[in-house]
Design a protein with these regions (language model features):
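Hydrophobic loop/turn residues within beta-sheet-rich immunoglobulin-like superfamily modules
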Residues: 18, 69-70
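N-terminus-biased targeting/localization segments
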Residues: 18, 24, 33-35, 43, ...
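P-loop NTP-binding core
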Residues: 2-13, 27, 37-38, 48-65, ...
């Protein structure tokens, strides 16, 4: 059945397609940056060019499916199906299958140099751990699946007029980013480790602290565990915390080039990943210097590939803490002649219902411009529930507002 498309050059066609083929078509077309109708057109064209019928495709359970094709193509395809002795349902199934075969899942683009993202703020309670975990999850999601992404409405509403999306509330289904991610729990309190359902490393055993102090008892890679959720495959790993990190500053105070202690410790494993995320403690001590040094811009590294991602809240005390942190970063830049990039500000736990303090503070963060706000994440129940369940947020509630906002953040800092 056909009916003219309002554009005049395409017509609507209605056929049948199994739900599995329809889903594969939707995902694969998105992965290749195509509209589904263009993929169907290409599949039909390829099918018509074959010298003989391909293998039959299982069409049991096929349901009504409509798309738009160039005027006349469907009639020609119908005639070809008749001449080849196959039904339209079988013909379109074969055409879609052919297109899927000749357009495999594209390989994930890997960064030229491992990205090192230092998630920081010396103020506790701003949600650094939740942002670290969520960002790592968003970066590691399945590249062969579509996930919902939307710019936070509070963020979008404050963008410059020229940058504002047509509908900031509209969801867009995009492929997962498929990055290989290492989360490093650099906070001796171990919140990141526990939130993801793992145990802290035992005192007296091996730990990141030992490796930073030059006293490692084995391979650092032996301490790394997998965050075992199907949507992340084997792409999301965790280096758990150990409470011996409370003594880290003392342990590395006399170490040669102590600011490079974290970099030396992670050197043996960083090459296995596309992104390394450091969940920093609420501290401005030597350990924070080591984290910032790890996130500096290395020789021949593009600006903005690595750096500091600062988590704040829409309230006054966050502004005071932000000033202390940026002073430390600027001191390191000056004292060690480092190139240290700011990846941006994340305003976390935002709730406009808290009134003028929240909304005016958000506006103040937006007005800074350098570093700019790269994400606004709401204060909603799903994150707390995920922590209670000891599961990653994006696996526990993949379509909740927080998950969607964090995916937008991951894409914003991956540009």
């Amino acid at each position: 059945m056909t009916s003219p498309d309002t554009g005049g050059d395409r017509e609507k066609v209605v056929t049948k397609l199994t739900s599995a083929l329809r889903q594969d078509l939707k995902v694969r077309a998105a992965l290749h940056g195509l509209d589904m109708q263009d993929a169907v057109e290409a599949g039909i064209t390829a099918w018509r060019g074959l010298g003989s019928n391909p293998a039959a495709v299982d069409t049991s359970g096929a349901e009504t499916y409509s798309t738009f094709l160039p005027a006349g193509l469907w009639d020609d395809f119908r005639e070809d199906c008749k001449n080849r002795g196959v039904s339209l349902t079988q013909g379109i199934a074969q055409a879609v299958s052919i297109w899927l075969d000749i357009n495999p899942v594209p390989e994930v683009k890997r960064p030229a140099m491992v990205r090192r993202i230092v998630v920081c703020n010396q103020k506790g309670g701003v949600g650094k751990t939740a942002i670290t975990a969520g960002l790592g999850e968003a970066l590691a999601e399945d590249p062969a699946a579509l996930v919902p992404v939307r710019v936070s409405k509070h963020f979008a509403a404050l963008l410059e007029e020229d940058d504002r999306p047509e509908d900031p509330l509209a969801l867009e289904d995009l492929p997962g980013l498929g990055q290989r991610v290492l989360l490093v729990d650099f906070d001796p309190q171990g919140h990141l480790t526990r939130q993801l359902g793992h145990e802290l490393l035992p005192m007296g055993g091996d730990s990141l602290t030992n490796h930073m102090a030059g006293d490692g008892k084995g391979e650092l890679s032996d301490l790394i565990v997998t965050v075992d959720e199907s949507r992340f495959g084997d792409r999301l790993h965790l280096l758990p915390a150990c409470t011996d990190a409370f003594l880290l500053d003392v342990r590395i105070a006399s170490v040669r080039a102590r600011e490079a202690a974290l970099e030396r410790a992670l050197r043996s494993v960083e090459g296995d990943y596309d992104v390394v995320l450091i969940d920093c403690p609420p501290s401005l001590g030597i350990s924070m210097d080591a984290a910032l040094y790890f996130g500096r811009r290395r020789d021949n590294e593009d600006a903005g590939n690595s750096g500091a991602l600062i988590v704040v809240q829409a309230e006054d005390s966050s502004a005071d803490a932000y000033g202390l942190l940026t002073s430390q970063i600027e001191d390191m830049r000056s004292d060690l002649a480092l190139d240290m990039d700011y990846l941006g500000l994340v305003v976390n736990h935002y709730d406009a219902r808290r009134g003028f303090i929240a909304t005016s503070s958000l506006q103040a963060w937006m007005d800074i411009k350098d570093p700019r706000v790269v994400g606004v994440v709401g204060d909603l129940k799903e994150q707390k529930e995920a922590v209670r369940a000891k599961r990653p947020l994006l696996a526990y509630a993949p379509r909740c507002e927080q998950s969607i906002a964090i995916r937008a953040l991951a894409r914003e800092i991956s540009k």
